[in-house]
Swiss-Prot record:
Disulfide bond sites: none
Pfam families membership: DHDPS
Protein known as: 4-hydroxy-tetrahydrodipicolinate synthase 1
Annotated pyruvate binding sites: 53, 209
EC supergroup of this enzyme: lyase
PANTHER family to which the protein is assigned, alphabetical: 4-HYDROXY-2-OXOGLUTARATE ALDOLASE, MITOCHONDRIAL (PTHR12128:SF66), DIHYDRODIPICOLINATE SYNTHASE (PTHR12128)
Keyword Flavoprotein in annotation: no
Role, per record: Catalyzes the condensation of (S)-aspartate-beta-semialdehyde [(S)-ASA] and pyruvate to 4-hydroxy-tetrahydrodipicolinate (HTPA).
Location of the protein in the cell: Cytoplasm
CDD domains: DHDPS
Catalytic activities: L-aspartate 4-semialdehyde + pyruvate = (2S,4S)-4-hydroxy-2,3,4,5-tetrahydrodipicolinate + H2O + H(+)
């Protein structure tokens, strides 16, 4: 379910959902359905499946399609489903895009091809070929720290002319470049780094794709709601309150997948282990995550008292 709002085609509050596994490491579709239902019930109007946080490098094509089908069954039309289909191979990416469309996705998240580091003209051709292949709208995923290749602002501007390229997940840490694209296109920008949600929203972003939302789905939705209501002071306060948890989950030297699953597991929510080469968080790390979570929960309780 994409929205009717061109400024936020996949909703405002998106979670980069983890992919739950069983204790033996198999895909846990029942757990995925329960987690997805919880996320939507608590404020997410969009879910990104099989992204980085969803361990897309270590799930099979069949698992990716099954995940979309199961989550669609769980959430119905209450949330948009964006399927991560990006790979280092254009042909494979197209195959995944077609499979995601058939499984019931509303949109595609397409990352810049990694490792091969194509030049900008080849990068542009890659995205156009994927966008041409299916009828689904596309969210470009700009995260050069992981892929080794930046989707340069001028390339994004050219790609914005494609009728199915409608959005960008922004993890480039380039505020000037983001504003350049926003000023020259109608693309919907989504903050892909939790610490940048309010700053990017304040300059015209559509919303966010958050890893931290796996644990606290209502947190950043409240930031956007406060800002939209004109209470910018409260929006800033809520964003700052999130800093300890965001730092623990996203800036402590471990991938967000690892920290999100550790905290979800500690809270008794569907998650399971991560797949190799990732390794699950140790007890000390998990204790630190729980402490940051508890601090945020205590702050929220005091503000409501």
């Amino acid at each position: 379910m994409t929205t009717d709002d061109d400024s936020a085609p996949f909703g405002r509050s998106l979670c980069a959902m983890v992919t739950p596994f069983t204790g033996s490491g198999a895909l846990d579709l029942d757990g995925a359905q329960r987690l997805a239902d919880r996320l939507v019930a608590r404020g997410c109007d969009g879910l990104v499946l099989s992204g980085t946080t969803g361990e897309s490098p270590t799930t099979t094509d069949a698992e990716k399609a099954a995940l979309v089908t199961a989550v669609r069954e769980a959430v119905g039309d209450r949330a948009a489903l964006v399927a991560g289909v990006g790979t280092a191979d254009t042909r494979h990416t197209v195959e995944l895009a077609l499979a995601a469309e058939k499984a019931g996705a509303d949109g595609l998240l397409v990352v810049a091809p990694y490792y091969s580091r194509p030049p900008q003209d080849a990068l542009e051709a890659h995205f156009r070929e994927v966008a041409d292949a299916s009828g689904l709208p596309v969210m470009l995923y700009d995260i050069p720290g992981r892929t080794g290749t930046r989707i340069e602002p001028d390339t994004v501007v050219r790609l914005a002319a494609h009728p199915r390229i409608v959005a960008v997940k922004d993890c480039a840490y380039d505020l000037l470049g983001t504003q350049k694209v926003l000023s020259r296109t109608g693309l919907a920008y989504y903050a892909g780094c939790d610490e940048q949600i309010l700053p990017l929203y304040a300059i015209g972003a559509a919303g966010y794709v958050s890893t931290v939302a796996n644990v606290v789905p209502e947190l950043f939705r409240a930031v956007l709601d406060a800002f939209d209501a004109g209470d910018t002071g409260r929006a800033a306060l809520l964003q700052r309150r999130a800093v300890p948890l965001v730092e623990s989950m996203m800036a402590a030297g471990l991938p967000g997948t690892v920290t999100a699953k550790a905290l979800l597991g500690a809270l008794g929510l569907p998650a399971g282990p991560v797949r190799a080469p990732l390794r699950s968080a140790d007890r000390e790390t998990t204790a630190g995550l729980l402490a940051a979570y508890g601090e945020l929960a205590a702050d929220a309780g005091q503000s409501q008292a």
